[in-house]
């Protein structure tokens, strides 16, 4: 599991930062990539990374402001042009379906893969399978905006191979049957129960990715005990009133959410273009005063998520 930040700016592109898009690489977990927001020129940013459009399985849109969605039509079309054939699902607030369908229709863009568009109308679980569960809550922004909590389900423990070898059990099909939890009778009549030969499960990771938001309780709830919290930090602490007026957060407010939620790690993104050069480091300094394990994302930077 790895984050690749494709765009970390706020509002409009700048020389140093493109607008919002985050790839969550789940190559080991499911051989796919999930994308969170898709601002203008996201597909161009992808060219500089290891992200492959054909592997994008899901796109989660936080809200419908242009700096979070204007890259969608181009990416969807290019994915088809580049040979993508597997199903892609887009999740987002009401209106995302109309935006995509009109853009594809007017531009006569035809996608050759199954495209599903899921409009989120209420809080709760928007996706769940045997590996992951994605929950969403409304945040506090000028238009409807969602945050996403991605929960990796606990992973079955490893087969205790040394224990089996110590009992004289030779590697082979019996190992797989035991790992699958079956009760197996060996040729010598010994009966082995699979559950006795499986180590403790590995706890799944929790990732929280928030859209644009004021400081709010929903952010804390989504981030509770997260391994990684990705939070916007559009403004410095001295501009807290301006952040409130424009429905955004300061770096210190993001750190406060991480602290209250008992998150393990905080990554700041959605940085205003007013913070050019090294001035953005002041945002990092302010956040670390409250929450030491804070990092600030820059375009094309990757962050692995360890177990």
Swiss-Prot record:
Transmembrane segments: none annotated. The active site is at 67 (proton acceptor). Binds 2 Zn(2+) ions. Its EC number is 3.1.26.11. Zn(2+) 1 binds at residues 63, 65, 141, 212. It is an enzyme of class 3 (hydrolase). GO terms for molecular function: 3'-tRNA processing endoribonuclease activity; zinc ion binding. Its cofactor is Zn(2+). Gene3D superfamilies: Ribonuclease Z/Hydroxyacylglutathione hydrolase-like. It catalyses: Endonucleolytic cleavage of RNA, removing extra 3' nucleotides from tRNA precursor, generating 3' termini of tRNAs. A 3'-hydroxy group is left at the tRNA terminus and a 5'-phosphoryl group is left at the trailer molecule. InterPro entries: Metallo-B-lactamas, RibonucZ/Hydroxyglut_hydro, RNase_Z/BN. Homodimer. Zinc phosphodiesterase, which displays some tRNA 3'-processing endonuclease activity. Probably involved in tRNA maturation, by removing a 3'-trailer from precursor tRNA. This is Ribonuclease Z. The lineage of its organism: Bacteria, Bacillati, Bacillota, Bacilli, Bacillales.
């Amino acid at each position: 599991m790895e984050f690749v930040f494709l765009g970390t700016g706020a509002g409009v592109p700048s020389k140093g930062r493109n607008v919002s898009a985050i790839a969550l690489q789940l190559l080991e977990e499911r051989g796919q990539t999930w994308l969170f927001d898709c601002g203008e020129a996201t597909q161009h940013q992808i060219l500089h990374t290891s992200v492959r459009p054909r592997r994008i399985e899901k796109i989660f849109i936080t809200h419908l402001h242009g700096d979070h969605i204007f890259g969608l039509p181009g990416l969807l079309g290019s994915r088809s042009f580049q040979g993508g054939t597997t199903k892609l699902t887009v999740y987002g607030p009401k209106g995302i379906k109309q935006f995509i369908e009109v853009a594809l229709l007017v531009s006569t863009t035809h996608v050759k893969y199954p495209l599903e568009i899921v409009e989120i109308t209420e809080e709760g679980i928007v996706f769940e399978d045997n590996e992951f569960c994605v929950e969403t809550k409304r945040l506090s922004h000028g238009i409807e905006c969602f945050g996403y909590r991605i929960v990796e389900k606990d992973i079955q423990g490893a087969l205790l191979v040394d224990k089996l070898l110590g009992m004289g059990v030779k590697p082979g099909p019996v190992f797989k049957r035991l790992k699958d939890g079956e009760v197996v009778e060996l040729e010598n009549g010994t009966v082995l129960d699979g559950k006795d030969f499986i180590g403790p499960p590995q706890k799944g990771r929790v990732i929280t990715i928030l859209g644009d938001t004021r400081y709010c309780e929903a952010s804390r709830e989504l981030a509770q005990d997260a391994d990684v919290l990705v939070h916007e930090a559009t403004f410095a602490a001295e501009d807290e009133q301006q952040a409130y007026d424009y429905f955004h957060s300061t770096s210190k407010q993001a750190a406060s959410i991480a602290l209250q939620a008992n998150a393990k790690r905080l990554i700041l993104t959605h940085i205003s273009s007013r913070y050019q050069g090294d001035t953005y480091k002041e945002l990092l300094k302010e956040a670390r005063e409250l929450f030491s394990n804070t990092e600030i994302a820059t375009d094309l930077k990757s962050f692995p998520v360890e177990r």
